Amino acid sequence: MNHPSELKYATTHEWVRIEGDLIVTGISDHAQDALGDLVYVEVPEVGSHMTAGTQAGVVESVKTASDIHAPVSGTVVEVNTALEDDPDFINDEPYGKGWIYKMKPDNIADVDQLLSNTDYEAGL
């Protein structure tokens, strides 16, 4: 499995990358591999405020469906609309084209409370 060291991870298998004062979020390589071929992604609404740990969306595969959780609290500022037509971007490039949404966190320091790649992998 590929879990880049520059990212942070939630125990619910989301990853976070800081870009300026925003965070970019998707699901980990481990999560997409466990789900199998994705066929549908429900993204959060732009402008919606989410609390850490609450449901932010859903990914569906040929095997099952799984909730996407907000890794930190904040407001959604952009979603990856390309996933509507190509949910398999998450399977092919979970940390690239497969990002799910961007958020303005209430407190960017909350990202520091998430797991490093080594701690995330140790919990798998």
From Swiss-Prot:
Coiled coil: none
Alphabetically ordered keywords of this record: Lipoyl
Cited SUPFAM superfamilies: Single hybrid motif
The protein's required cofactors: (R)-lipoate
Manner of cofactor binding, per the entry note: Binds 1 lipoyl cofactor covalently.
GO cellular component entries: cytosol; glycine cleavage complex
Swiss-Prot/TrEMBL GO biological process terms: glycine decarboxylation via glycine cleavage system
Subunit structure as annotated in this protein's UniProt entry: The glycine cleavage system is composed of four proteins: P, T, L and H.
NCBIfam families with a match to the protein in the record: gcvH, PRK01202.1
Described function: The glycine cleavage system catalyzes the degradation of glycine. The H protein shuttles the methylamine group of glycine from the P protein to the T protein.
Name of this protein: Glycine cleavage system H protein
Organism whose genome encodes this protein: Acinetobacter baylyi (strain ATCC 33305 / BD413 / ADP1)
Gene that this sequence comes from: gcvH
